[in-house]
């Protein structure tokens, strides 16, 4: 398992600089090294890069919380509201098809886009920036049309399915190259880590912003629940007209207004990213004539031990946090009885996460990333146990929400901070292959979305077996118990499994420092005017 991991990193750090930098044929190279290390990003550059993460989070949060209720209650013509059994409206089955197909397509597009990016040539704008530039107009158009109710009776399901899948494709064409851009904004590990901390702060704020904008503008669209003849509680569509403060048409306009605001945020953030960030090419990469073939690169990436261990560990921890996220509103509403407080609890979690991301950035710089993983993610366990055992208490629930936000911040920051270390390690072992960065990032996003789909399926099936009543004001005790397990016990088990896998992750702080020295020697050798293919062959043999 670990036959040569320590030895390989040691040789990369020790033999590489000695064999290359001490060459008597290039004595001036050592004198140039201090200047090459000054590749710091300004705060403005980091903010411009960080703002590029907001569109994905703002739109994803709005769709995640509101698309289902929009398809069921709003995506129909005015005359169909009264005749709630009209065959022309988007019913629950059609809505489930739209949501499932859209989510599945979203996961599939990540490796497909990664494939296309890996084959993209380097242009005057870079390799990644053209994807961000040309996907933005199509993404905002598709997003706006998702929230538009077409004025024709037939084919509404196809309308929403088309534009939902189109938007997911375009936002993937934006987000995958944006994620891979981390490797090209700077060659310094510390600068990339700092920029990642800025990015995670903005992305957490983006989730808060998406929820706030959509919730405040379309909050009137919520349907109340009523008691039926069997003493169970169901929602009434006609109640929207009796108890709502806006008409159905005004509700549709409210969704369009919210979409327009979010589209403006998307465009502004994309423009700032494009104008404020310059994609930098590695000197040693420029010597290669063309990128590695995709499937060969995929085989090399998937055989890279640190990457597999990293994504497997985060797959379990991501699944844990997504189970909590997907069932938190239902848990607060039915198990804890805080129907009117869940919005504020969500806000407490996200604000806590936003405020603590800089603290985690300092922590991982001071104590190392593996230590930050253990401390940050495991800190959620005692609070989940407390939630499982305590009685319904609003003050304690708020305290737990704030504490949970601290762990959420670590879960947001650490994967994106550790992925560049894995890619650096890969580049040292495969110095002649480039263009694999989109593969690393796209497959990490793919596995994250896979975890999201699994958590959604597990939750839905579990609640269905427990007898969940759709849109009920209360639920049977079995449903409350199931929600308790989904939000507390199941995530605890998954977190412990993930932390166990992280024990096998080989890149610690010492290995990171060794890799940094070896990469710097590789860059200096490649950028030197006297660099030859003989030296590159020597470098590959040493590594």
Curated annotation (Swiss-Prot):
In placenta, associated with trophoblast cells. Changing residue 66 to A: Abolished lysophosphatidylcholine (LPC) transport. Residues 71-94, 148-157, 222-241, 334-344, 390-392, 467-478 are extracellular. GO terms for biological process: brain development; carbohydrate transport; cellular response to starvation; cognition; energy homeostasis; establishment of blood-brain barrier; fatty acid transport; hippocampus development. Changing residue 412 to I/W: Reduced lysophosphatidylcholine (LPC) transport. The chain crosses the membrane at residues 41-70, 95-115, 128-147, 158-182, 190-221, 242-275, 307-333, 345-363, 368-389, 393-429, 440-466, 479-502. Changing residue 361 to W: Reduced lysophosphatidylcholine (LPC) transport. Belongs to the major facilitator superfamily. It is linked to Neurodevelopmental disorder with progressive microcephaly, spasticity, and brain imaging abnormalities: An autosomal recessive disorder characterized by impaired intellectual development with poor speech, progressive microcephaly, and appendicular spasticity. Brain imaging usually shows abnormalities, including enlarged ventricles, white matter defects, and atrophy or hypoplasia of brain tissue. Some patients have a more severe phenotype with seizures, lack of developmental milestones, and early death. This is Sodium-dependent lysophosphatidylcholine symporter 1. It comes from Homo sapiens (Human). The lineage of its organism: Eukaryota, Metazoa, Chordata, Craniata, Vertebrata. The gene is MFSD2A.
């Amino acid at each position: 398992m670990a036959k040569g991991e320590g030895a390989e990193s040691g040789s990369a750090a020790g033999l590489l600089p000695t064999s290359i930098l001490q060459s008597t044929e290039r004595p001036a190279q050592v004198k140039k090294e201090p200047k090459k290390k000054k590749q710091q990003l300004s705060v403005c550059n980091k903010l411009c890069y960080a703002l590029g993460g907001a569109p994905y989070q703002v739109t994803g949060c709005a769709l995640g919380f509101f698309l289902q209720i929009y398809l069921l209650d709003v995506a129909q013509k005015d005359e169909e509201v009264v005749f709630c059994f009209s065959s022309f409206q988007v019913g629950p089955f059609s809505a489930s098809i739209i949501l499932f197909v859209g989510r599945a397509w979203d996961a599939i597009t990540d490796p497909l886009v990664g494939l296309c990016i890996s084959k993209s040539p380097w242009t005057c704008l870079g390799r990644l920036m053209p994807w961000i530039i040309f996907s933005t107009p199509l993404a905002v158009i598709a997003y706006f049309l998702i929230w538009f109710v077409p004025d024709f009776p037939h084919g509404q399901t196809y309308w929403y399915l088309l534009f939902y899948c189109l938007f997911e494709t375009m936002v993937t064409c934006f987000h995958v190259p944006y994620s891979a851009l981390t490797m090209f904004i700077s060659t310094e590990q510390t600068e990339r880590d700092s920029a990642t901390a800025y990015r995670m702060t903005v992305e957490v704020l983006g989730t808060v912003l998406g929820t706030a904008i959509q919730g405040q503008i379309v909050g009137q669209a919520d349907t109340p629940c009523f008691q039926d003849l069997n003493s169970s509680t169901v929602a009434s569509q006609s109640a929207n007209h009796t108890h709502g403060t806006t008409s159905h048409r005004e509700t549709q306009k409210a969704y369009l207004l919210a979409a327009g605001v979010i589209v403006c945020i998307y465009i502004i953030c994309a423009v700032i990213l494009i104008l404020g960030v310059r994609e930098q090419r590695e000197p040693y990469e420029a010597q290669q004539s063309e990128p590695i073939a995709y499937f060969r690169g995929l085989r090399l990436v998937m055989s890279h031990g640190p990457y597999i261990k990293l994504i497997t560990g985060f797959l379990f921890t991501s699944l844990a946090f997504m189970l909590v996220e997907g069932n938190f509103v239902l848990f607060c509403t039915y198990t804890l009885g805080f129907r009117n407080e869940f919005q504020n609890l969500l806000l407490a979690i996200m604000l806590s996460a936003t405020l603590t991301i800089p603290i985690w950035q300092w922590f991982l710089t001071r104590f190392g990333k593996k230590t930050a993983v253990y401390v940050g993610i495991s800190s959620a366990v005692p609070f989940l146990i407390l939630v499982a055992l305590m009685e319904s208490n609003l003050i304690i629930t708020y305290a737990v929400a704030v504490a949970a936000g601290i762990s959420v911040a670590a879960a947001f920051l650490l994967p994106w901070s550790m992925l560049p270390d894995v890619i650096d390690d890969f580049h040292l072992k495969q110095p002649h292959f480039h263009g694999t960065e989109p593969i690393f990032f796209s497959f990490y996003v793919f596995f994250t979305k896979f975890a999201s789909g699994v958590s959604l399926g597990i939750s839905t099936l579990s609640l269905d077996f427990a007898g969940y009543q759709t849109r009920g004001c209360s639920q049977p005790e079995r449903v409350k118990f199931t929600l308790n397990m989904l939000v507390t016990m199941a995530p605890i088990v998954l977190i412990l499994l993930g932390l166990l896998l992280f024990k096998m992750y080989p890149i610690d702080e010492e290995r990171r420092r060794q890799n940094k020295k070896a990469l710097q020697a590789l860059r200096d050798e490649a950028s030197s005017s006297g660099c030859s293919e003989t030296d590159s062959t020597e470098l590959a043999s040493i590594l």
